[in-house]
Design a protein with these regions (language model features):
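Cleavable N-terminal signal peptides
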Residues: 6-7, 17-18
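A short tyrosine-centered beta-strand micro-motif
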Residues: 80-86
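Extracellular beta-sheet/turn segments enriched in Thr/Pro/Gly and aliphatic residues
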Residues: 108-148
């Protein structure tokens, strides 16, 4: 009987998926204030294409601050491909401020792995995706203040 229970426990635990933490290093802060950085995560290309409607807000724990960057830990991210977007919430409103019909961001934003000085378009999935496994995964987000053509 004990062997049956051991086999059942083995089967249950062998299918368990272990989530990993993502360490996010955010840099290029033009505004030297202590306003929070807000994160959103996306786990597929289909989700990424939907832009703001596809991404899900996620909390990041601030673990290090210096003059050049801030480091955050996002806990328990499911293994697989994903992308992050971030914005510096300058007015602490809890939402990305946009202007006009085109919805141009009024606060600095960035995406995982995207290293540009100016955002001209929504980045492609292959430009921003990264792999998460059960170990800690590190990714850079460079904030950008300039948008458009």
């Amino acid at each position: 009987m004990i062997f049956v229970w051991l086999n059942i426990l083995f089967i249950i635990f062998s299918f368990q998926v272990f989530a990993g933490d993502v360490i996010v290093i955010v840099d290029r802060f033009k505004h030297k204030n202590e306003a929070p950085v807000k994160f959103s995560i996306c786990d597929s290309e289909e989700c990424h294409i939907k832009r703001d409607k596809g991404y899900v807000d996620i909390d990041g724990e601030l673990i290090e601050v210096n003059d050049n960057f801030r480091k955050y830990r996002i806990k328990n991210v499911e293994p697989g491909e994903c992308s992050l977007s971030a914005y510096h919430d300058l007015n602490n409103s809890g939402k990305l401020e946009r202007s006009g019909i085109l919805g141009i961001p009024q606060e600095p934003i960035g995406f995982s792995r995207l290293d540009v000085q100016k955002i001209r378009r929504h980045p492609k999935w292959d430009e921003v995706k990264f792999h998460v496994d059960e170990n800690d995964t590190s990714v850079m987000v460079h904030l950008v203040n300039r948008f458009g053509l």
